[in-house]
Amino acid sequence: MSQNAEKITDLKTALYDFHVSVGGKMVPFAGYQMPVQYPEGIMKEHLHVRANAGIFDVSHMGQFSIYGTEEEYLPLEKIVPIDLKSLNNNQSKYTVLMNKDGGIDDDLIVTKVEGGLNIVLNAACKHHDIKRIHEVIDPSKTKLHKDLSLIAIQGPKAVEILDNIIPGVSALTFMNGSKFKLNNEDIYVTRSGYT
């Protein structure tokens, strides 16, 4: 293995120490050390999420922003086939990133926010996707956020549980988000995602 490849698999999310402390079996994934399972096992985890809810650290995914006016981010429509003008603030769309031949390179979620767009990119492809986006968007108007965590909560009781911790979350409709405070920290919650 090359020295560069070893470095890439040494990346850790902010929750790495927590995962290890609760017995997470850590494996390399998309350049990060990520938990693949916990001591109770995959089946028990799966059944718990299906009946209740589960928390997933997906901080290895790309959290990418495009800053600027609508005029500055509209060129993204050349490679992402959605109508960005039709998005309301805090509304998300699941879409694809097209290659130069009009085929699909990847899928992603785009959210319109005040001052631009937030995009969640797949972990394994994020650097390729950013390079493609930079073909139509000025790189000085973009940022890959390496200092943010991304947590997914899934399951039939996810909204109920989260609303007890962050009142108001239950008012969000699918593919919409909002800013909230949690322990005096600014957070952004969307009711979106797919698996």
Identify what each model region corresponds to.
Residues M1-T195:
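Basic, glycine/lysine-rich polyanion-binding surfaces/domains
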